[in-house]
Amino acid sequence: MGAVRIAPGLALLLCCPVLSSAYALVDADDVMTKEEQIFLLHRAQAQCQKRLKEVLQRPADIMESDKGWASASTSGKPKKEKASGKLYPESEEDKEVPTGSRHRGRPCLPEWDHILCWPLGAPGEVVAVPCPDYIYDFNHKGHAYRRCDRNGSWELVPGHNRTWANYSECVKFLTNETREREVFDRLGMIYTVGYSVSLASLTVAVLILAYFRRLHCTRNYIHMHLFLSFMLRAVSIFVKDAVLYSGATLDEAERLTEEELRAIAQAPPPPTAAAGYAGCRVAVTFFLYFLATNYYWILVEGLYLHSLIFMAFFSEKKYLWGFTVFGWGLPAVFVAVWVSVRATLANTGCWDLSSGNKKWIIQVPILASIVLNFILFINIVRVLATKLRETNAGRCDTRQQYRKLLKSTLVLMPLFGVHYIVFMATPYTEVSGTLWQVQMHYEMLFNSFQGFFVAIIYCFCNGEVQAEIKKSWSRWTLALDFKRKARSGSSSYSYGPMVSHTSVTNVGPRAGLGLPLSPRLLPAAAATTTATTNGHPPIPGHTKPGAPTLPATPPATAAPKDDGFLNGSCSGLDEEASAPERPPALLQEEWETVM
C-alpha cells in the first residue's frame, strides 16, 4: 500500500487560509466585541469546512501506511518534551506499543471542533496547532493539543462522549485575569470620574461666559465652542458605553470562555440586518464625530492665538465664522466619508471594530491636527521666550525669566493638547507590561481631565471673569441690603450717596466693586465735608457745590489697557485686532497675564 509522508507544515495546511482571511478583518488595535467574535467564528467555520471537503476527496492522504508515520508528527515538539506528562501524558495503551510500530495505522481525520481546524493526525502522536488569531482573547503564542490513538480516532475524555483537547495555553488570559481586571477597573474609574468632573466644570464655565455680556467677544466665543466640544465628547462616550454594553457586563461582552466559544459556533449566524445594529452604530458615529470636533476646536484655539501674534491685519469677527465652519464642519466631512465606506464595504456589527485600514479615514485627519497644533505651540513658545528676553533685559535674572516661561508654557499646554503628542506614535497594542499600564493611565487621566483643566485655567482663573462675578455678587448683596433696610424703614434712599449710621456708600462707578467708603478712610477735608454739613447730615441726593469728590478709579490702581488673550479680557480686543500693527508692548501684556 502506498505511503504518504505528512510534510512538517501540514498541521497548518487547513488553518492558514482561515487565519489569513480572518486576520484581514480583525484590526490589531481595536477591542473585539461579542458580535464581531461570533461573525469571525462562523467565517472560520465555513472556510474550514470547505478545506475539509477538498482534503477528504483525496483518499491517498488517509490510506493506511505500511512504512509507518515515523516523521509524520505535526506537533513540532521534540519527543522528550512530550514525555514530560504535564500537558499530554502517554496512555497505557501507547506505552505498551513498541516505538517502531507506534505510527502504523490509519491517521485521525481532520475536523472542525467549533474553535479551530484540526489537521490529519498521525496515530499515536499528539497534534499541536497554534491558537487561532481570530479569537481575540486567546494567547496567540500558545498551542492547542489533541491525541490521535493507534486506531485512527481522536482520543476521548474518559467517561465523556467528547474529544479530548487541551486549550490551557490558549485560554491562560481568560483563566488568570484577576490582576488585569483590576487594572481595567481602575482605568474605567479614572476616565468615568475625569469626564464627569470635566462635564460639570465645563457646563458651569459655558453658563458664566454666556451670562455676562461684558465677556462676549471673539476669543470667549471660541472658548465656548471648545468647551462645548469637550462636553459633547464626554456625553458621547457615556452614551456609547451605555448602548454597546447594555444588557451585559464588560466581562460578558468581551471575555468568552472555551465552552462559550463552542456554544457560539454551534449557534446560527448572527443577523446581518442593519436595523438590528442601528442604535449602536449611531452611538459610535456620533462618538467619532464629537471626538474629531474636539481635536479640531483645540486646533482652532491654536490657529487663533497664532493669528493674533503673527498677522498684522486680522479681523476677529470675520474669521470667527470661518473658525466655526472649520471646527464643526470639517470633521463632519471625513466622518461622513467613513460612514459611507463602512456601510458599503464593512457593514458588520456595531462599527466599533475598525475593520482594517478604513480606520485611517478618521485617524489621519485627527493625527494631522495634533501635529499641526504642536508645531503652532512650539512657534508660540519661541516667540514668548524671545519677548521675555527683550522686555525683561536687565530687570530680572535668568532664573526668573525661565520661571515665567515655564509658567506660561504650562498654561498653554492644556489648550493646545500637547499631551497627545507623547504616545501618538506608539499604539497601545504595540506595548505590553508596565509600559502599557503607564501609557493607558497617562492617556486616560489627561484625556478625561483635559476639559476640567481648560475650564479652570481659561474661565475660573480668568481675571475678568472673576471681576464680573464679584460685581454681580456685590449687586446682589446690595439689592438684598436695600430690601432689608427698606422693610425696616431705618434709612431713606435715592440715587445719591446712601446714608447710614456708620458709613456713606457711593452708588457710582465704585458701587460695582462693592466697596463701602468709611469716613475714617477718607482724607480729612473729604471726610468732614462728606460726613456732615454744618453739623447736620447731608440731604439725600444733594451735593454741595465745590465739594471735593473721590475719583472713580485711583490712578495708582488703574487697570491696564488690555488684560490680554490668555487672561480673558474682552475690553478693546476686538477693536485693536484690526489695527495695522500690534505694538510689541501690547503683545507683551497679553503674555504677562499668565505670569
From Swiss-Prot:
Keyword annotations from UniProtKB, A to Z: Cell membrane, Disulfide bond, G-protein coupled receptor, Glycoprotein, Membrane, Phosphoprotein, Receptor, Signal, Transducer, Transmembrane, Transmembrane helix
Glycosylation sites: N151, N161, N166, N176
PROSITE patterns: G_PROTEIN_RECEP_F2_1, G_PROTEIN_RECEP_F2_2, G_PROTEIN_RECEP_F2_3, G_PROTEIN_RECEP_F2_4
Subcellular location: Cell membrane
Cytoplasmic side: 210-223, 316-318, 382-404, 461-595
Keyword 4Fe-4S: no
Chain ranges on the Extracellular side, renumbered to this chain: 29-188, 245-294, 340-360, 426-439
UniProt-annotated stretches for the region Disordered: 66-103, 528-595
GO cellular component: plasma membrane
One Pfam match: 7tm_2
Top-level taxon in the UniProt lineage: Eukaryota
Homology family: Belongs to the G-protein coupled receptor 2 family.
Quaternary structure annotation from Swiss-Prot or TrEMBL: Homodimer in the absence of bound ligand. Peptide hormone binding leads to dissociation of the homodimer.
Function in brief: G-protein-coupled receptor for parathyroid hormone (PTH) and for parathyroid hormone-related peptide (PTHLH). Ligand binding causes a conformation change that triggers signaling via guanine nucleotide-binding proteins (G proteins) and modulates the activity of downstream effectors, such as adenylate cyclase (cAMP). PTH1R is coupled to G(s) G alpha proteins and mediates activation of adenylate cyclase activity. PTHLH dissociates from PTH1R more rapidly than PTH; as consequence, the cAMP response induced by PTHLH decays faster than the response induced by PTH.
Protein name per the record: Parathyroid hormone/parathyroid hormone-related peptide receptor
The species this protein was found in: Canis lupus familiaris
Top-level taxonomy: Eukaryota, Metazoa, Chordata, Craniata, Vertebrata
Gene label: PTH1R
